[in-house]
């Protein structure tokens, strides 16, 4: 919105009578929640989730009540800015917190989801997110694979025995 207001100000310097409408815009990374909540008359929520390195983080997301839609940024729960430079290794980062945000939104009545994937620190293919929702990713011995991208090569089975019931709706 900031860039839009700056552009509007510049246009008005040239033509004070020009009608300029500033609308939210985002690329799927940081700022997506803010833009869509503002543009769709939503509200913001905050939830404590598992960050990309397993530490707790507070993630902001949006809810558009009229459509029961949650607006989530991966960057808020699994963002690159949450990982210090010396620990930036996608083999060890997880999207688990994104699944926790989705679960929180489901508990608040959301059934549709917009997930912006920009700004992510992860490359686990969404496995962590699905684990948070109750899916199990098993290796050839029936054991849970390692978290993050490290375990991807070992997945031989996916089970849904513990998936939250709302996902069947």
Task: Give short role names for the model-derived ranges.
Residues 2, 6, 93-96:
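A general alpha-helical scaffold signature found inside nucleotide-binding enzyme cores
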Residues 33-34, 84, 125-130:
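Short acidic, glycine/serine/threonine-rich loops at helix termini
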Residues 2-5, 52-55, 135, 154-157:
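Short amphipathic alpha-helical surface micro-motifs
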Residues 92-96, 100-116, 121-168:
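Glycine/threonine-rich beta-strand-loop-alpha-helix active-site module
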Residues 5-82, 149, 167-169:
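Glycine-rich nucleotide/cofactor/substrate-binding loop typically near the N-terminus or early
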Residues 56-121:
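Anion-binding (especially nucleotide phosphate/pyrophosphate-binding) glycine-rich loop
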Residues 1, 26-29, 117-124:
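Gly/Ser/Thr-rich loops at beta-strand to alpha-helix junctions
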């Amino acid at each position: 919105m900031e860039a839009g207001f700056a552009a509007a100000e510049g246009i008005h310097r040239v033509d004070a009578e020009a009608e300029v409408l500033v609308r939210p815009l985002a690329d799927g990374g940081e700022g997506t929640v803010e833009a869509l909540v503002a543009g769709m008359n939503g509200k913001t929520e905050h939830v404590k989730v598992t960050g990309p390195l397993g530490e707790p983080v507070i993630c902001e997301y949006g809810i558009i009540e009229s459509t029961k839609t949650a607006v989530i940024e991966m960057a808020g729960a699994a963002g690159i800015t949450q990982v210090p430079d010396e620990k930036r290794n996608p083999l060890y980062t997880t999207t688990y917190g994104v699944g926790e945000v989705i679960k929180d939104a489901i508990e608040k009545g959301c059934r549709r989801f917009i997930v912006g994937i920009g700004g992510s620190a992860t490359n686990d293919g969404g496995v962590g997110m699905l684990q948070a929702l109750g899916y199990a990713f098993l290796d050839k011995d029936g054991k849970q694979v390692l978290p993050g991208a490290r375990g991807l090569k070992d997945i031989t089975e996916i089970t849904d025995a513990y998936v939250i019931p709302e996902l069947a709706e």
